[in-house]
Every structure is written in C-alpha cells, then in structure tokens.
Amino acid sequence: KGAGVAVALSLAAVTSVPALAADSIVQAGETVNGGTLENHDNQIVFGTANGMTISTGLELGPDSEENTGGQWIQNGGIAGNTTVTTNGRQVVLEGGTASDTVIRDGGGQSLNGLAVNTTLNNRGEQWVHEGGVATGTIINRDGYQSVKSGGLATGTIINTGAEGGPDSDNSYTGQKVQGTAESTTINKNGRQIILFSGIARDTLIYAGGDQSVHGRALNTTLNGGYQYVHKDGLALNTVINEGGWQVVKAGGAVGNTTINQNGELRVHAGGEATAVTQNTGGALVTSTAATVTGINRLGAFSVMEGKADNVVLENGGRLDVLTGHTATNTRVDDGGTLDVRNGGTATTVSMG
C-alpha cells in the first residue's frame, strides 16, 4: 500500500475496476499464493492467484456496480481455490478464469468470463452475466445461481431451492435462468426456475426436485421429480419416468411428452399437451377443459373442445367430463377414474 501512486497509474489499463482502494496487482506471468482481501482492498489479477480469501466487495449489496473492493480477474488472469465469504466479491471479467471457488455466507461471484467447479454454500451467490460461462457449479443449501440473459451455465448440480415445497417461491435460492442452462441435474430439494427469456436443455430431475418453466425447457427427464409448465411456458421432449410428474398449467404448453410406467402427466384446464406418448402404466390426469392429443395402447386419442375420445385411464389416471362435455370410447383400467359431472356425457366406456 506504500506505493499508492504507482498502483494508481497502473490501474489506468485495468478493465472495469473502480478507482478506489486499489491495493495489489498480480502481473502476467506472476503467481501469488494465499492472502486475504478485506476493508475494500482490491486484487487485480493478470497472472495467477491461488488460495485467496475474500471478505470485501459486496458491502453495498449483491451484484451492485456501486461496490468497491474484492478480486478482479482480468483477461488472461487465473484464480484458483479461492474462498469468497461474508461481503466478499470475486469479479471474473471477459477472458478471465476462476476454478474451484467456494462461495459462502453471503459472498458472491460476478461472471463475464469462465468459472469452473464453483461451490455455492449457505447464501453464496453466482451471477452469470452476458458472455459469462459457469461450468460444474454445485448449489448447496441456500446457495443461488442467477444466469442472466446471454449467460450460460452447464453441468450445474442443484441441491436447494425447493425446501418450501413443490413449485413454491423460495426467493433467491436454487437456480434462476434468463439465459441458457444446459445439462443440469436437479436433486432432492433442488429447483430450477426458467424465466420468460430463459432456455434449459437436457435437464435431469430426481425425486424431490422440480423445474418451474416460464420460458422453454427442452429434453427434460423426470426421474421422480416435477416439472411445472406455467402460462406462456413451453416444454418439449419431456420423458416422465416412475414417480415423475409433468404439470401443465393454464396457458402452458408441452409437446412430445412420453409417459412411462408410474409417471404422470397432469394437464389443467386451459393447458395444452400435444403429441403425447402414453405407455402402459403411465397416468394421464386431465379434464375436458384441457387440450391433449397423442397415442396410447388403443391408438390415437384426443381431448379438445369439450370432447374426449379413446382416452386410457389407469394407475392414478383421471378424466373429468365437465358439464355439457362428452367422452367416447374411454378405457378405465385398474387405478383409473372417470368422473362425469352433472350435465356431462360418457358413452362406450370399457372397464379393465
């Protein structure tokens, strides 16, 4: 800190660093091992910094440009095995790389470069901005990853966000996607929220985990988990295996869903599911106020415009025929329910 004038002059060439409390620069080709940043200290990394502990840079709130202090990884810079703790901030700029970072207790990582194998614990946060790539992030209890428009997260493992129950609002935990998320694994208590502009591809959801779709979800596999498709949300090519549920709410749409044995597709009134494949033992739960088309073991089936035809109900499946609506050629097998409301009509019902 004694060479403050020289440090200040060097900062003229540094990208996106506030001109306050600049304390150390790791030059290209230089390696620094260990150390602590606090009290608005800055570390500007063009070379390599290993094993730093950061507890400054977020005093003015998460992901705020008004903050000063923290670690700044420049183009070509590398940070490894960093611990970011209370009020700490690591900024990874375009061309910079951070690996094996642990973020906890209210610390955060702002990412326009590359982050590999980040772990988010107790209120640790990662913000993936436009151009940023996060790969292999693990989100543990009360951790949070925000993938902004133009950001990419790949191989994320989500273990938090759904502790309050399926499809509930747990605020800033789990993963929220405005950009792109690929090859995500959602475990028990994990939640991925895909916002209107967001896209999620190749997601695996296990029992106790869920995905809330307001944007687009492609190629999701439900191995006991839940997928909720909300108004204006779209899910394509979902596979529902044992214990999995796909729930299509009013204004939501899904296409090419496959329901396997002990899986369940629920389509609410005003929801739409097209090109469904219902395999033996798969359950369809819907009403004549929804739109559902596809194939089952009887052949083509449909529910649309108040008319249901060739529907198979089994293993928890249910069809509600509403007032003024009709159902024809319905097959009700073990565990299936056909509920014809007052004023509804069902003809040619066969029982298993």
Feature locations, PLM:
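Extracellular beta-strand repeat scaffolds in secreted/surface proteins
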Residues: 42-45, 69-73, 88-92, 107-112, ...
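Bacterial Sec-dependent N-terminal signal peptides
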Residues: 1-8, 14, 20
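Short, T/G/N/S-enriched strand-turn elements that build extracellular solenoid repeat scaffolds
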Residues: 24, 31-38, 49-64, 79-85, ...
